[in-house]
Amino acid sequence: MEAFRTHTGIGVPLRRSNVDTDQIIPAVYLKRVTRTGFEDGLFAAWRNDPSFVLNQPPFDQGSVLVTGPDFGTGSSREHAVWALMDFGFRVVISSRFADIFRGNAGKAGLLAAEVTQDDVELLWKVIEQHPGTEITVNLQDRSVTAGTVMVPFTIDDYTAWRLLEGLDDIGLTLRKLDEIEDFETHRPSWKPRTLPA
């Protein structure tokens, strides 16, 4: 997983709340056996509407999604995070995330930055008044900057550390590879093995 320090990209105002994972990516798109190629399913029902924000330039090139509260509710779908990332998003900003979505996002490298609802409204105002406004999200100092507006965001320290280090679950495990190999070499030969003999 790529380490995350800062990201600058076009802000996209998604003026919707209670966006569940089935709205992010409908179940029909979950049949794939790969982890990529889900961008066509992102907000599929809404993208049929030509006036939907992601169908409008310059928002169709955005990489920082600013959305209403309760984003990512519903079932646990890693595919929802993958669809957002495959479309090009690196950051989602909201005043409240579903816990399971927040966890899946952090494990995949998507930053879920939590701000106050007043700050969401302020960011929406800036990017709607000036389409194409670039938003810079700095994980190290936990700030969001859009033009002259700067707001703080919150994220738990553990997830921030994983993102800063670029550590997914496999990366975390591989940090302990020496200890794993040492354990395996000292296991009695009659026990099952995970490493070749």
UniProtKB/Swiss-Prot annotation:
Question: What's the EC number here?
Answer: 4.2.1.33
Gene Ontology biological process terms from the UniProt entry: L-leucine biosynthetic process
Q: Any keyword Lyase?
A: yes
Q: Which reaction does it catalyse?
A: (2R,3S)-3-isopropylmalate = (2S)-2-isopropylmalate
| Disulfide bridge partners, by residue number | none
Q: What UniProt keywords apply to this chain's record, in alphabetical order?
A: Amino-acid biosynthesis, Branched-chain amino acid biosynthesis, Leucine biosynthesis, Lyase
Record pathway: Amino-acid biosynthesis; L-leucine biosynthesis; L-leucine from 3-methyl-2-oxobutanoate: step 2/4
What InterPro entries does its record include? Answer: 3-IsopropMal_deHydase_ssu (IPR004431), Aconitase/3IPM_dehydase_swvl (IPR015928), AconitaseA/IPMdHydase_ssu_swvl (IPR000573), IPMI_Swivel (IPR033940), LeuD (IPR050075)
A GO molecular function annotation here is: 3-isopropylmalate dehydratase activity
Q: Provide the Gene Ontology terms for cellular component.
A: 3-isopropylmalate dehydratase complex
Q: Give the multimer and partner information.
A: Heterodimer of LeuC and LeuD.
Family affiliation = Belongs to the LeuD family. LeuD type 1 subfamily.
Entry function: Catalyzes the isomerization between 2-isopropylmalate and 3-isopropylmalate, via the formation of 2-isopropylmaleate.
Q: Which protein is depicted?
A: 3-isopropylmalate dehydratase small subunit
Point out the gene that encodes the protein: leuD
